[in-house]
Amino acid sequence: MRQGRGKILVIRGGAIGDFIVTLPVFAALRRQFPGTHLEVLGYPHIAGLAAAGRLVDTVCSIEARALAGFFARGGGLDERLANYFAGFALIISFLFDPDGIFQENVTRCSKAQFIAGPHRPDEKLNLHATEALLKPLERLTIFDADPVPRLKLVAPAAGGHVARQPGREAARGSEASEPADKDVGATGRWLALHPGSGSERKNWPEENWIYLLQHLHRATKFNFLLVGGEAEGDRLQRLSTVLPTTRIQLAQSLPLVELAWQLRQCAGFIGHDSGISHLAAALGLPGLVLWGETNQAIWCPRGDRITVLTSNGGIAGVTVGDVVAGVRSRF
């Protein structure tokens, strides 16, 4: 693709962490093709982060039912979607497409240069996820991209166009906006804690979180923002009873962009191997990430101010003392 010509589409599904480690791809494309319209086909509640950071111009929903036809060989293709794909000069897909059926169908209706990237990094290569996702951009002579995800939130422009269905015009006012109530940082210094993840085996024991909160309450002047969603269940409510209500606040099941605004105002972050830890790192927060058995070389959150705490005994072997020492040195 020649600079300044056509539009670029990046197709990226996956969970929060999967999307965050793709942010360097958007940043590299912005740098290589300044002024070119850049769009992402993904899950709007996650991909909206890229729009909030002005890394993309438009977010389009990957949940369109008609998209399923593009994964069947020789089937009929939805006309609106076919015209949608035809509107791009460059399409980069990180979808799981082992037989190349999706690529084959897209190229039936679009003359765009199509680049297929990995939906997940190859564990055998031991290459960090951000670097694995940047590899396909070498076909565009992009070799020196910054592999660290960086998210600088920008207040939305009036009437911004962001989320829409493929092949349809964007709805005005659809942009995930900066929340009106962003006063976390206005009442002292806040420390964000995410005591959950997508898997229980990645979680530090709940009693350790209790001891940690009690110690930090006594030894510091921090207020505490407890972060979580459905995966945490009642854990946040249980932990919130440990401290006076004047020192603790829940941020549970917030829209992701709103959560990002809240996190951005915190002095630091403590969490597990989770997408929220990747988000905190991308926002530039100093952070402590309590790590278990996942391959750290591939999946560790990348950030200039992130410290990983681990032990030979897995995440359960990380002590409250280890975390307290990390808080003292980092925050």
Language model features: what each stretch is:
Residues 1-331:
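Catalytic machinery of carbohydrate-active enzymes
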